[in-house]
């Protein structure tokens, strides 16, 4: 009987499967910021399926060979144990398990039986490993189906009614929806870097969009489309639903509801503007229904400069640039826990409220405390939302909006 080749094949199969499972068992490396393409996912899935089918076919062939050996050994054992003496002659018995001729001694039979048991054990192990591999393939298939479902969900369309927009203009209703599909779409389509780029691509409807400035992960912004381009809304005050007396980290990362009151975040604004020429627009509203708008050419520094804001005289307003500070002066951002204002004797953010480019505390503060009516006491009013050169230092405004727009390529 020729068991050695079969045993060798089984051992080789076992080693190959063990190697495969060893590679599979390694911890997955940290997720990188790039997703594999759909073609690469298909190639990987096809390769895994082919490998699983090959393993199964090899095991089935080996099992069939071992089954034949077991049948012959069983027949030989039955003939040797026949009490009536009707067993075949010793040579015929040996030929049952050794068709090539030669004597099969009891030691040979015991050796064959030991080999058969060992190979049966290995076969069982192989079947367990193949079953494990099959489960892994099924999980991979589920992941592929999930990816396909997400791709279908992110087809080029608007949320409600517009079906002909490019996929990278995908709109989402809530900031929380950035997790999951929002990151996937950035791997499938290049997202716009700001609202102005959306405008240049033909978008004319204001609303919530995903953008991805250079060097930044994707995030949700509120875009306002006007006749002179797309503006990114970075702040809105309207009803006092959000507390703006926040620490430095909150002003850095952003807070609030992008469909209501919110602060986008200094780091996000810095990524949007980058080193490009930019302008900042401020929209103000008082309690009598009057409104005013201003625009400033600006440059916003990074965190190493405390997000310093440098501005020059306004380009579209009857109000003076002294609302912020003397023209050309660079003002760092301040909060109650990080004081960067120009006053050496006090912390403007603690004395007033909220975080802002305070300067000397007296020019403006659009992140101050929100009042639903004008307080009678002056000490209270100074903590409110104010713009000194419009409605005065002690008039708390009803609503404000701050927007930014790049004016030149980087």
From Swiss-Prot:
<keyword id="KW-0443">Lipid metabolism</keyword>
<dbReference type="InterPro" id="IPR037579">
    <property type="entry name" value="FIB_ANG-like"/>
</dbReference>
<dbReference type="InterPro" id="IPR036056">
    <property type="entry name" value="Fibrinogen-like_C"/>
</dbReference>
<dbReference type="GO" id="GO:0090318">
    <property type="term" value="P:regulation of chylomicron remodeling"/>
</dbReference>
<feature type="domain" description="Fibrinogen C-terminal">
    <location>
        <begin position="186"/>
        <end position="408"/>
    </location>
</feature>
<feature type="signal peptide">
    <location>
        <begin position="1"/>
        <end position="23"/>
    </location>
</feature>
<comment type="subunit">
    <text>Homooligomer; disulfide-linked via Cys residues in the N-terminal part of the protein. The homooligomer undergoes proteolytic processing to release the ANGPTL4 C-terminal chain, which circulates as a monomer. The homooligomer unprocessed form is able to interact with the extracellular matrix.</text>
</comment>
<feature type="glycosylation site" description="N-linked (GlcNAc...) asparagine">
    <location>
        <position position="184"/>
    </location>
</feature>
<dbReference type="GO" id="GO:2000352">
    <property type="term" value="P:negative regulation of endothelial cell apoptotic process"/>
</dbReference>
<keyword id="KW-0175">Coiled coil</keyword>
<keyword id="KW-0325">Glycoprotein</keyword>
<feature type="region of interest" description="Disordered">
    <location>
        <begin position="81"/>
        <end position="106"/>
    </location>
</feature>
<dbReference type="GO" id="GO:0042802">
    <property type="term" value="F:identical protein binding"/>
</dbReference>
<dbReference type="InterPro" id="IPR002181">
    <property type="entry name" value="Fibrinogen_a/b/g_C_dom"/>
</dbReference>
<protein>
    <recommendedName>
        <fullName>Angiopoietin-related protein 4</fullName>
    </recommendedName>
</protein>
<dbReference type="GO" id="GO:0043335">
    <property type="term" value="P:protein unfolding"/>
</dbReference>
<dbReference type="GO" id="GO:0072577">
    <property type="term" value="P:endothelial cell apoptotic process"/>
</dbReference>
<keyword id="KW-0272">Extracellular matrix</keyword>
<dbReference type="InterPro" id="IPR020837">
    <property type="entry name" value="Fibrinogen_CS"/>
</dbReference>
<keyword id="KW-0037">Angiogenesis</keyword>
<dbReference type="GO" id="GO:0010903">
    <property type="term" value="P:negative regulation of very-low-density lipoprotein particle remodeling"/>
</dbReference>
<dbReference type="GO" id="GO:0035473">
    <property type="term" value="F:lipase binding"/>
</dbReference>
<comment type="function">
    <text>Mediates inactivation of the lipoprotein lipase LPL, and thereby plays a role in the regulation of triglyceride clearance from the blood serum and in lipid metabolism. May also play a role in regulating glucose homeostasis and insulin sensitivity. Inhibits proliferation, migration, and tubule formation of endothelial cells and reduces vascular leakage.</text>
</comment>
<feature type="disulfide bond">
    <location>
        <begin position="348"/>
        <end position="361"/>
    </location>
</feature>
<dbReference type="GO" id="GO:0001525">
    <property type="term" value="P:angiogenesis"/>
</dbReference>
<dbReference type="GO" id="GO:0006629">
    <property type="term" value="P:lipid metabolic process"/>
</dbReference>
<dbReference type="InterPro" id="IPR014716">
    <property type="entry name" value="Fibrinogen_a/b/g_C_1"/>
</dbReference>
<dbReference type="GO" id="GO:0007596">
    <property type="term" value="P:blood coagulation"/>
</dbReference>
<dbReference type="Pfam" id="PF00147">
    <property type="entry name" value="Fibrinogen_C"/>
</dbReference>
<keyword id="KW-0732">Signal</keyword>
<keyword id="KW-1015">Disulfide bond</keyword>
<dbReference type="GO" id="GO:0005615">
    <property type="term" value="C:extracellular space"/>
</dbReference>
<feature type="site" description="Cleavage">
    <location>
        <begin position="171"/>
        <end position="172"/>
    </location>
</feature>
<feature type="disulfide bond">
    <location>
        <begin position="195"/>
        <end position="223"/>
    </location>
</feature>
<dbReference type="GO" id="GO:0055102">
    <property type="term" value="F:lipase inhibitor activity"/>
</dbReference>
<feature type="coiled-coil region">
    <location>
        <begin position="107"/>
        <end position="155"/>
    </location>
</feature>
<dbReference type="GO" id="GO:0070328">
    <property type="term" value="P:triglyceride homeostasis"/>
</dbReference>
<dbReference type="GO" id="GO:0045717">
    <property type="term" value="P:negative regulation of fatty acid biosynthetic process"/>
</dbReference>
<dbReference type="GO" id="GO:0004857">
    <property type="term" value="F:enzyme inhibitor activity"/>
</dbReference>
<keyword id="KW-0964">Secreted</keyword>
<dbReference type="GO" id="GO:0062023">
    <property type="term" value="C:collagen-containing extracellular matrix"/>
</dbReference>
